[in-house]
């Protein structure tokens, strides 16, 4: 497999970008980081078409609603801000966490927003309500909640206490799977049957959500200190990850073999990665504020 660098987006950022995401159509990209601004790009033209400024501290995560008309962002100022994409205005500002908010995620129909914080709590927000209070607080983590994903009826959370917690909304149950190192990234499959878990021991594991068994492991990257996210491609056959050695790594999901890796020019750390929803493209963010789109074939 060959990786081809297609585009470098003019990010304007001089500081680390902590999160980058394609929207559901893949026509637009949102990214944010330590500069406290969310930027929106048109992928085809490569132009930055809007900037959303309003956070008082670094932005650590963001997520879009299903139809891409709104997005939520969070970070060091302990607030979630829900933005109208077209007007650039903040529709809602949600507080309650006692420390920085590391991660946020909408469910499939964007009716629920989950937020995870350094305060070890997960808060669930009803997006159909005008309430500024969470509908539920999940207080099971013993340390910072670093990552959340939602698929089908499962809310899956990773914590620096080394535990993956899976909340089954239908059954009202909690299952816990312990990893020996802090968890930094969680990505659950569309069917909610397995999850991709990154942790601070330079390894990524594929976990069976039903049994809690580790099905596959992916090694070769460097991840010992920072949050470095991993993901699947759109067909969930390839595992992608950034790395603290300035590279992007790809593995075959089934046989665990490393397909390829490539060094990203000008950066020591690749912080985040987002795969295009329909094409064989992915975008990466770096600690030096760069955004690169790659094609794999």
From Swiss-Prot:
InterPro entries with a match to the protein in the record: G-protein_beta_WD-40_rep (IPR020472), WD40/YVTN_repeat-like_dom_sf (IPR015943), WD40_repeat_CS (IPR019775), WD40_repeat_dom_sf (IPR036322), WD40_rpt (IPR001680), WD_repeat_MORG1 (IPR051980)
Entry's localization field: Cytoplasm; Nucleus
Keyword Iron: no
Superkingdom classification of source: Eukaryota
Gene3D superfamilies the record matches: YVTN repeat-like/Quinoprotein amine dehydrogenase (2.130.10.10)
GO biological process: mRNA cis splicing, via spliceosome; mRNA splicing, via spliceosome
Alphabetical UniProt keywords: Cytoplasm, Nucleus, Repeat, WD repeat
Disulfide bonds: none
PROSITE patterns from the UniProt entry: WD_REPEATS_1, WD_REPEATS_2, WD_REPEATS_REGION
Pfam families: WD40 (PF00400)
GO cellular component, one term: catalytic step 2 spliceosome
PANTHER family per UniProt: WD REPEAT DOMAIN-CONTAINING PROTEIN 83 (PTHR22842:SF3), WD40 REPEAT PROTEIN (PTHR22842)
Family: Belongs to the WD repeat MORG1 family.
Protein name according to UniProt: Uncharacterized WD repeat-containing protein C713.05
Biological source species: Schizosaccharomyces pombe (strain 972 / ATCC 24843) (Fission yeast)
């Amino acid at each position: 497999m060959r990786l081809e660098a297609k585009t470098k987006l003019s990010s304007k950022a001089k500081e680390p970008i902590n999160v980058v995401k394609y929207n559901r159509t893949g026509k637009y990209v949102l990214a944010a980081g330590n500069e406290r601004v969310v930027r929106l790009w048109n992928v085809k033209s490569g132009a930055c078409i809007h900037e959303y400024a309003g956070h008082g501290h670094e932005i650590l995560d963001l997520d879009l609603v299903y139809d891409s008309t709104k997005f939520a962002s969070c970070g060091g100022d302990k607030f979630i801000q829900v933005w109208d994409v077209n007007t650039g205005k903040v529709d809602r500002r949600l507080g309650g966490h006692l420390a920085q908010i590391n991660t946020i995620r909408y469910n499939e129909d964007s009716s629920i927003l989950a937020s995870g914080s350094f305060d070890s709590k997960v808060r669930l927000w009803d997006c159909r309500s005008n309430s500024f209070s969470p509908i539920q607080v999940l207080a099971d983590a013993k340390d910072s909640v670093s990552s959340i994903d939602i698929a089908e009826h499962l809310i899956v959370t990773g914590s620096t206490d080394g535990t993956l917690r899976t909340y089954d909304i239908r059954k009202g149950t909690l299952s816990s799977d312990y990893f020996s190192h802090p968890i930094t990234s969680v990505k659950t499959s569309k069917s909610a049957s397995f999850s991709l878990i990154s942790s601070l021991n330079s390894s990524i594991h594929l976990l069976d959500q039903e049994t809690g068994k580790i099905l596959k492991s992916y090694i070769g990257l460097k991840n010992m200190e920072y949050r470095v996210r991993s993901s699947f491609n759109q067909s969930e056959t390839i595992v992608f990850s950034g790395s603290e050695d300035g590279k992007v790594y790809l593995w075959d999901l089934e046989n665990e073999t490393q397909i390829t890796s490539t060094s990203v020019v000008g950066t020591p750390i690749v912080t985040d990665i987002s795969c295009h929803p329909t094409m064989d493209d992915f975008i990466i963010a770096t600690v030096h504020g760069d955004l690169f789109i790659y094609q794999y074939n």
